[in-house]
Curated annotation (Swiss-Prot):
Record key words, sorted: Cytoplasm, DNA-binding
Protein's recorded name: Nucleoid-associated protein CKO_02678
Protein function: Binds to DNA and alters its conformation. May be involved in regulation of gene expression, nucleoid organization and DNA protection.
Coiled-coil spans in chain: none
Species of the source: Citrobacter koseri (strain ATCC BAA-895 / CDC 4225-83 / SGSC4696)
HAMAP family assigned: DNA_YbaB_EbfC
Alphabetized GO MF terms: DNA binding
A single cellular component GO annotation: bacterial nucleoid
Length: 109
């Protein structure tokens, strides 16, 4: 199944991959992205751990319907969560690129 030194090389690659993934996860946790709704009237900023860091609401919305404002805040948060997920996938894909994995081997482990 594995050629001469193949298993050893695979284990070495797996260890390197694990180190890179841990480093990438630390970087991702520090990332901040901003989601928007209502054409930018509501903005929610979250970090890579999905913790809300900031909520910005245009003053014009404070006079409007409370339910609409709540919906806009939820939509902005969901937009931010979607953006951080996309960023995480892109960064993690870059970690595994270049590895010579056996067919059918899925990452992360």
């Amino acid at each position: 199944m594995f050629g001469k030194g193949g298993l050893g090389n695979l284990m070495k690659q797996a260890q390197q991959m694990q180190e890179k993934m841990q480093q990438m996860q630390e970087e991702i946790a520090k990332l901040e992205v901003t989601g928007e709704s209502g054409a930018g009237l509501v903005k929610v900023t979250i970090n890579g751990a999905h913790n809300c860091r900031r909520v910005e609401i245009d003053p014009s919305l404070l006079e409007d319907d409370k339910e609409m404002l709540e919906d806009l805040v939820a939509a902005a948060f969901n937009d931010a969560a979607r953006r951080i997920e996309e960023t995480q996938k892109e960064k993690m894909a870059s970690v595994s690129s270049g590895m010579q994995l056996p067919p059918g081997f899925k990452m992360p482990f």
